[in-house]
């Protein structure tokens, strides 16, 4: 089951992001699923090292961050594939407005004797103002040859063509932007497997997006 950690709000079934350990070891056949959420008004640093130590282990890390004013948010993630036949996935999406600062530092390390590895990392961001800044640094360090690994990062703005289309369908501009932002963040929310918890988190995210200045 996915564990959800939140900064800036709470919901039944979630945990404060401050309770997330800074280092987690994953043994053979074990699976860890974590979703980390940072909402407007919360500044935080999230250092996390995952040691994947046993064959058949799987790690899924997802997160979203919504910054609207002067928040400072940093994700510093290190995933170490210390055993063969292991899998890791990372998906982090963020929105920054005002004069906020966000950073995603993601590092995947595959040891030389760790073969048959699958490791994937994505970080996508949207800026809402000229003063907001997002730093993204995805990194792969691969010392084995039998691997399937990828990483990628994007930073941009809300899609004006999509807004134009929605406005042509009678959707007000402000609502079109809100819908775009929610859609952008929804792949992270969708990682939550419990339907009731997913709905509660989706409501928090929608409220947070509607509080932003577009």
Regions found by a protein language model. Name each.
Residues 1-164, 168-171, 185, 192, ...:
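Conserved beta-strand/loop scaffold segments within soluble protein domains that form the structured core
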């Amino acid at each position: 089951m996915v564990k959800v950690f939140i900064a800036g709000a709470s919901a039944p079934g979630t945990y404060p992001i401050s309770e997330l350990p800074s280092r987690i070891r994953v043994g053979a056949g074990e699976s860890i699923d974590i979703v980390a959420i940072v909402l407007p008004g919360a500044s935080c640093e999230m250092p996390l090292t995952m040691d994947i130590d046993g064959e058949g282990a799987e790690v899924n890390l997802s997160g979203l961050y919504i910054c609207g004013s002067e928040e400072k948010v940093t994700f510093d993630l290190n995933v170490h594939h210390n055993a063969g036949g292991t899998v890791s996935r990372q998906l982090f999406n963020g929105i920054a407005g005002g004069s906020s600062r966000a950073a995603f530092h993601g590092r995947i390390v595959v040891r030389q004797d760790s073969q048959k590895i699958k490791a994937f990392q994505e970080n996508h961001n949207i800026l809402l103002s000229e003063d907001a800044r997002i730093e993204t640094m995805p990194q792969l360090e691969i010392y084995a040859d039998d691997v399937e690994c990828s990483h990628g990062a994007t930073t941009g703005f809300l899609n004006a063509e999509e807004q134009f289309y929605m406005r042509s369908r009678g959707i007000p501009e402000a609502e079109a932007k809100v819908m775009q932002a929610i859609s952008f963040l929804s792949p992270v929310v969708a990682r939550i497997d419990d339907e009731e918890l997913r709905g509660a988190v989706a409501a928090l995210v929608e409220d947070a997006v509607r509080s932003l200045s577009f």
